[in-house]
Regions:
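Non-catalytic, soluble scaffold/interaction modules
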Residues: 1-333, 339-346, 373, 377, ...
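Conserved alpha/beta-domain cores
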Residues: 260-589
Length: 589
């Protein structure tokens, strides 16, 4: 928070997750928690409680489908697909069966039992150091509230039904909240909690509603009716803005509108530097419908297809045929551009209960997951590999293995892949004769041994999010030490150069698929280090493309030489920003 005693203007800083600037009166939405009273029931009442539960699930499913339809009609099926995760919750047989069992054993009312079971599911996901899985926890919480309201005979909450335009301030917003709000009267959104990857943030961007999250206890500091200016680009919520501030933001908004218009013109252009070097610019996706954004933003295919969603919130593992159909359809839509599929990066604790025997881990993020889990559960691994190989018949599929720590793991993974190829050949099932295989470099040991791994694969893809986290021993979602998560740390740059040099020494291409690839301030650094491909969130592709088109490889290499003489992350970042500002300063404003 910052303020000026003379003007009484007060600024609160959060994370801007949906661009745009809005000004208006605040409406503070207080959380309406559903109080669930616990009471005993007789064994003879269990059947009635089950009937109530089933009715509430049906009502909830219908409400979700109605919201999904409204979103599909107003902003498109891609965003409406967000509610598929909600439907999975109300159809989750594992969760439902546990509720039914506890009804019979605990002999308590179904509201209490359902809340207890669903809350435990959500809390388990919330403890995981993964924004995607934490978002699934919010989905469960959202659906839980809706089911309980239906069990209690209450109508859906209407606190978002504003009668005049306001800036909405809330503790948190679920996808249901965002989909249900009266968009004509919501100028902008600010919340205590949330992240850029939250479904509410995604919907806000699609609805073109400026939004800020992570303002901590902003709901306790503001009152309905206060005048605020919301900057969804840089994350500032300004209370009682001065005329000077209002005028400054009007000018900023005008400039940004011009930049946005220019970026749209780049959709059909290639990401080629001023001196003629082509940098492959791909997009990261999680769901099949994300391909819409890949196409809309002019990306050259998919540099990272996270396949984890196929395994989450379901009572059984996905079959080979189910996976094949999904991968094939995505590949066909992306063709002729490449589709790089990462084998699933989860631990056994995220799969359907009873699928594998697992033990509690103190630190699952450093534990039994990704390729480590796959190599101990060959049947699950081979099912996915066979599906990917079958989809490779489309002609543009590549595969990469996550969390490789050394040569033995990589060779074992490739051996399993070769077994799957032989099985498909024996069954005379179509697949690509030549399939490119890559290793994700996201563990320091793999970075240091990149020259040992390179001869075994066709490309290297650097997962900078985890590589930085592991190299610096920093939990990037821990607010107390998040400032130590520094992509420009001298050690990180040396690891990146080590990887790029190893790849090129063996005539491989090397890419970056972490958040660094979408940071336009760091694009000159990555090009100077020798990266051949950058894969970022689709929405960032036009900005990265413009950055690439504004640079030359020699000046980027010179930048790297200079940064290797600097001692701190802040000094290196300042030098990167200097070049970025010189070449495309309008994008940084």
């Amino acid at each position: 928070m910052s303020g000026d005693n003379a003007s009484k203007e007060i600024r609160f800083e959060g994370a801007g997750v949906s661009p745009g600037i809005a000004r208006g009166r605040v409406h503070v939405a207080r959380d309406e928690l559903e109080e669930v009273v616990r009471y005993r029931i007789a064994p003879s009442q269990v059947t009635d409680e089950i009937a109530r539960f089933e009715t509430a699930l049906i009502q909830t499913r219908m409400q979700i489908l109605q919201m999904q339809q409204r979103i599909a009609e107003s902003i498109g099926t891609k965003d409406a697909a967000i509610f598929d995760a909600h439907l999975l919750v109300v159809e989750d047989r594992t969760l439902i069966d546990e509720v039914l069992r506890k009804l019979e054993t605990d002999l308590c009312n179904v509201e209490w039992v359902f809340q207890e079971v669903a809350t435990r599911y959500a809390e388990t996901l919330n403890k995981i150091d993964d924004p995607y899985l934490r978002e699934r926890a919010l989905d469960i919480q959202d659906v839980t509230k809706r089911v309980i309201r239906n069990l209690q005979g209450k109508s859906p909450k209407t606190f978002l039904a504003l009668t005049e335009p306001h800036i909405l301030v809330a503790h948190n917003l679920t996808p249901s909240d965002t989909a249900s709000m009266d968009r004509a009267n919501v100028l902008g959104v600010a919340t205590d909690l949330g992240s850029r990857t939250s479904h509410a943030a995604i919907l806000a961007r699609s609805l073109n509603i400026p939004a800020i999250v992570g303002l901590h206890d902003i709901t306790a500091k503001l009152e309905t009716g206060q005048d605020v200016l919301l900057d969804g680009n840089d994350g500032w919520l300004i209370v009682d803005p001065t005329p000077k501030t209002v005028a400054e933001y009007a000018e900023i908004e005008s400039r940004r509108a011009k930049v946005t218009a220019k970026l749209k013109e780049l959709r059909e252009t290639t990401s080629t530097t001023r001196d003629g070097r082509h940098i492959v610019l791909s997009a990261n996706i999680e769901l099949p419908q994300d391909v819409d954004a890949v196409e809309a933003n002019g990306a050259e295919g998919v540099g990272l297809y996270r396949t984890e969603f196929l395994y989450l919130n379901r009572p059984t593992l996905p079959s080979e045929d189910e996976q094949y159909e999904i991968y094939r359809k995505v590949a066909e839509r992306v063709r002729p551009d490449p589709l790089i599929i990462r084998t699933f990066d989860l631990g056994g604790d995220k799969l359907a209960p009873g699928t594998v025997d697992i033990a509690d881990e103190l630190n699952p993020f450093l534990g039994w997951r990704a390729i480590r889990f796959c190599l101990e559960n060959i049947d699950i691994f081979k099912t996915q590999l066979r599906a990917i190989l079958r989809a490779s018949a489309v002609g543009n599929v590549k595969i990469m293995f996550p969390m490789i720590s050394g040569l033995d793991e990589l060779r074992r993974a490739i051996a399993v892949l070769d077994e799957c190829k032989e099985e498909l050949r024996s069954s005379k099932i179509d697949m690509a004769e030549r399939l490119e295989v890559g290793a994700m470099i996201e563990i320091p040991s793999a970075a240091i041994c990149a020259s040992v791994l390179a001869p075994e694969v066709d490309f290297l893809s650097i997962g900078t999010n985890d590589l930085i986290q592991y190299a610096l021993a920093v939990d990037r979602v821990n607010e107390k030490i998040a400032h130590l998560y520094e992509p420009t740390h001298p050690a990180v740059l040396r690891l990146l150069k080590m990887i790029a040099d190893a790849a090129h020494a063996h005539n491989l291409w090397v890419g970056v698929c972490g958040e660094m690839a979408g940071d336009i301030a760091l694009v000159p650094l990555l090009l100077g280090l020798g990266m051949d491909e950058l894969s970022a969130a689709a929405i960032l592709v036009p900005r990265v493309k413009r950055a690439v088109q504004s640079l030359t490889i020699p000046e980027c290499r010179e930048l790297v030489e200079e940064t290797f003489k600097l001692d701190t992350a802040s000094e290196i970042l300042a030098r990167c920003l200097e070049l970025a500002d010189k070449r495309y300063g309008d994008l940084l404003g």
